[in-house]
């Protein structure tokens, strides 16, 4: 899963950098990361954070900034964390990992989520399954 995630993340970030090549140091691309860092799925979340950091290191750009939030494997906490990221001016979020945590994300229409779930049916309109 790590290799797939790193490949996807690097490809996506390179596309962002090409599209936003005029970004200045003061105007970085902000990307949210919603993962479980506590609870039963904490190890998976930690691996995703590690893969994200490796991908950022491989990209070698200071134009990307990752904002990490622990969702506790809880749909309500996921929604709350997504709103917090939105308040920071973030409009693209990687995660959540599990389908159950997508439950309320359609309430935030102007955010796009790149979910790591393998389910593709009945996703909210603002969720892209990788």
Residue ranges and their predicted role:
Residues 92-130:
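Extracytoplasmic ligand/sensor domains, especially the bilobed periplasmic-binding protein
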């Amino acid at each position: 899963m790590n290799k797939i995630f790193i490949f996807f993340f690097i490809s996506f970030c390179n596309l962002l950098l090409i599209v936003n090549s005029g970004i200045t140091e003061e105007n970085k691309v902000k990307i949210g990361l919603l993962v479980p860092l506590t609870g039963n799925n904490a190890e998976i979340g930690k691996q995703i954070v590690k893969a994200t950091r490796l991908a950022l290191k491989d990209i070698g750009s200071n134009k990307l900034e990752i904002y990490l939030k622990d969702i506790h494997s809880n749909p309500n906490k996921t929604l709350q964390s997504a709103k917090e990221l939105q308040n920071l001016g973030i409009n693209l979020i990687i995660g959540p990992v599990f389908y159950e945590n997508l439950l309320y994300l359609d309430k935030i229409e102007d955010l796009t989520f790149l979910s790591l779930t393998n389910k593709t049916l009945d996703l909210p309109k603002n969720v892209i399954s990788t």
